[in-house]
Amino acid sequence: IKSVVRPSFTSDFRLALGFARSRSVIVGIIAITVIVDMWATPIRSIIPVIGEDDLGLSPLLVGVLVSSQGVGSLIGAALIAFRGDPAKYGRIYFYGSFLYLIPALLFSLSNWFVLSLPLVFIGGLGLAAFSTTQGALILMATPPEMRSRMLGLLAVGIGIGPIGILNIGLMATLFGPSRAVMIVSIEGIVALAFAAVVWPMLRRGEDISPS
């Protein structure tokens, strides 16, 4: 029986990085994932604090506020699953990221529950658009023999999330929770605008297949 020699982790990782660099669209997908997980998704951890401290909500209404994002995400994911066109996943992914951050910025400026609630709900729709298409885009842009490696790189990008939580926690300590959400939202929007220039194929909805 012949033994199978498996490549080392470092050589496998270098191979994955080399392939990703050769495909600009993959770099763009992972870059937007890093942006969202650094500056967007950590905002969820501050919503209850804003609800209680800045909006003066009861525990029940704080729960309603936080859960509205989950409702938005559920509806958004269902719409994409049953009505989404894979040819438009690039646009859904890109603009969904904005659809999370822009309502988050407006939420940081709101003093009323009746305004904050739909903003958090809309953010949930954006989060669903982002999260349900990122893995699919990697698969669509990668040949079968490289898909597992590219999904691994995507997971590395997602792993930046805890750093984002530490960042927004520091901002909240220094400037208060609402101001922290405003700061990180603006940072994320600026970063996404930069990504729109560097990787325009996603916002344009271009064909990203490896052929």
Where are these regions (language model features)?
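C-terminal transmembrane bundle of multi-pass solute transporters/carriers
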Residues: 12-14, 21, 35, 47-211
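Juxtamembrane intracellular "pre-TM" segments in multi-pass secondary transporters
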Residues: 1-31
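Short helix-kink/termination motifs in transmembrane helices of multi-pass secondary transporters
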Residues: 29-30, 38-50
